[in-house]
Every structure is written in structure tokens, then in C-alpha cells.
Amino acid sequence: MSDNRVYSYSAVLMGSPILLKLYSHDEALASRVFQLIKRYEDLLTVNRAESQVMDINHAAGRHPVTVSRPVFQLIQCAKAASMVRDSAFNLAIGPLVKLWRIGFHGHSVPDAADIRARLALTRPQEVILDETTCSVFLQQPGMELDLGAIAKGYIADRVRDYLRQQQVEKALINLGGNVHTLGEWTIGLKKPFADAQALIGSLTINGQSVVTSGTYERYFEQDGKRWHHILDPRSGYPLDNELDSVTVISTDSLDGDIWTTLLFGLGVEKGCAALRQREDIDAIFVTKNRDIILSSPQRLRFSPLDSGYQVIDCTA
């Protein structure tokens, strides 16, 4: 029974601190939610030796691998996003991620020749899907799927669905960059390259997902330059444009994952143009010049909290 107090439960999963907020004291429910997250992590991760995705990668260039229906459907969705013309999203980016090692020990800027060689292994059209058998085949030896840009969104949606089944009316799940809600919540937007508690603004949402991707999340510095983890599958290098972060507000967190990556690749002007075709998706762009650009000021309930940033309309 709810007593109008917020109860917080936490765990470390998927390499991130996971936070669940409920309006009832229910440790058993929290435990079941964390078990659900762990189950999907075990299916989708590439950061350990065994998972269904790693089975696909190990069989690259040799034979198709049959996977569970949820994993197949997620890969199907990821391939569709990867095949969009000039897309910055690529489910086959694994060889580049491993080469750069950003966020892991031993990172450095790779040789240009090594980057070119890995780029040849990242063609999404060479990920062959067979819906009849639920099988996935990577055509070239050395190809690797990496669903890191999409797995959290998929899992956040499954948590939302599970909480709804349990008749939970108000809850928040934070998977580290992916926030999903039941009911109305106000959440903070982090200030790039600042203390963890520093915010540029707050956003009030109701039953929606908020996904933020920022260059400040994982990076290293070399030769006087900052190299971040958001890799451009077209060049093989970190995306280099006017953006520090992109936040996407959507019904499904999976869409948020896909669109943060797509919008990072498009940049502000093209990104705003793309969003005019999508009334179901909104975005907040934060630029290196300290502009906060709202795709739809009339729909977004955003309150600025840092006078060093200027809020402007996407159409301005």
C-alpha cells in the first residue's frame, strides 16, 4: 500500500548503478525487478564470455546462431536503425568499440590503418537475419555485434511492462542514462563536464522515458584532445560536432536509445528537421557553446537551472 513516501532500491547491474523508486515499501518487488534486469543482461551483454550475443560473435564468418525471440527482435530493430541512410547508429560497431577501449583500461588513439581495417568489419548489411529460424549470421570473420547503445532502453521497457503487470501506478527506474517512469516525475539534466550533482535544468514527464547520451560520460585525453565514447561508424572516430549531449523524451526507452545516437550523428539543424516528422519524440540538445535547444518548447516541461546556459527553440 502506498503511503506517499518514495522508497529507493539500488543495485549494480550492466556496469552501472541501477535505481528503482516506488511509492510503497516492497523489497520483494524490487528484488524481482533486479532479477529481471539481470536475466536480460545475461542475454545481451558483450562484456563477458557467454551470452546469446557473444554466441553470435564467436560464430562470425562460420555459421548462423539461433537465439531467443526477444534477442532476435532487438537485433532486428537495431539493424533497421543501422540501415537508415547516413545513420550514426550501427549494431555491428563492436570491432571499433574494442579497438578504442574507451572506458576500459589501456585506451589510446588507434592507428588510422587499424581504424580502416575495423571499419570494413562494421557493415550492418552483412548481419543476416532469418525470421523463420530466429537465427543471426555475421558474414565476415571478425565481425561483432555490440548492442550497448540499445540494450538499456530495451530492458527499461521490459521493467516498465513488468511494473504495469504488477499494478504499480507510480515508479521510476534509472538504468544509468535511461530513465523510465510510471506516473509523473521531475528529473534533473546533468551539466556536462561538471560535478555529478550539477544540473542545467529539470524536466517533468508523465509515463515517459528520458534517455541522455553525452560526450562527458566516458572519455580520455590524449595529445591535448578529448576522445569520447560516442563513435561515428562512418569515420571510425568519436563524433565531432557542436554537441555535448542529447536527451530524448519518448514513450519507449528503446526509441530513446536509437534517437539519441541518430540525433548525435545528425547535429542540431538536421536533428531538429528530423524531429518535425515525429510528434511522438522530443529532444533537448546541449551544445558546446552552452545553448540548450528544445525541439518542442510547447510540449516539453523544462525548467532551466543554470544561468550560464541559454534556452532556445529548435525553430529559432
Curated annotation (Swiss-Prot):
<keyword id="KW-0274">FAD</keyword>
<keyword id="KW-0479">Metal-binding</keyword>
<keyword id="KW-0963">Cytoplasm</keyword>
<dbReference type="GO" id="GO:0005737">
    <property type="term" value="C:cytoplasm"/>
</dbReference>
<comment type="function">
    <text>Flavin transferase that catalyzes the transfer of the FMN moiety of FAD and its covalent binding to the hydroxyl group of a threonine residue in a target flavoprotein. Is responsible for the modification of the fumarate reductase KPK_2907.</text>
</comment>
<feature type="binding site">
    <location>
        <position position="231"/>
    </location>
    <ligand>
        <name>FAD</name>
    </ligand>
</feature>
<keyword id="KW-0808">Transferase</keyword>
<feature type="binding site">
    <location>
        <position position="152"/>
    </location>
    <ligand>
        <name>FAD</name>
    </ligand>
</feature>
<dbReference type="GO" id="GO:0016740">
    <property type="term" value="F:transferase activity"/>
</dbReference>
<dbReference type="GO" id="GO:0046872">
    <property type="term" value="F:metal ion binding"/>
</dbReference>
<dbReference type="InterPro" id="IPR024932">
    <property type="entry name" value="ApbE"/>
</dbReference>
<keyword id="KW-0285">Flavoprotein</keyword>
<feature type="binding site">
    <location>
        <position position="257"/>
    </location>
    <ligand>
        <name>Mg(2+)</name>
    </ligand>
</feature>
<feature type="binding site">
    <location>
        <position position="149"/>
    </location>
    <ligand>
        <name>Mg(2+)</name>
    </ligand>
</feature>
<dbReference type="InterPro" id="IPR003374">
    <property type="entry name" value="ApbE-like_sf"/>
</dbReference>
<feature type="binding site">
    <location>
        <begin position="88"/>
        <end position="90"/>
    </location>
    <ligand>
        <name>FAD</name>
    </ligand>
</feature>
<feature type="binding site">
    <location>
        <position position="14"/>
    </location>
    <ligand>
        <name>FAD</name>
    </ligand>
</feature>
<feature type="binding site">
    <location>
        <position position="146"/>
    </location>
    <ligand>
        <name>FAD</name>
    </ligand>
</feature>
<keyword id="KW-0460">Magnesium</keyword>
<feature type="binding site">
    <location>
        <position position="261"/>
    </location>
    <ligand>
        <name>Mg(2+)</name>
    </ligand>
</feature>
<comment type="similarity">
    <text>Belongs to the ApbE family.</text>
</comment>
<dbReference type="Pfam" id="PF02424">
    <property type="entry name" value="ApbE"/>
</dbReference>
<protein>
    <recommendedName>
        <fullName>FAD:protein FMN transferase</fullName>
        <ecNumber>2.7.1.180</ecNumber>
    </recommendedName>
</protein>
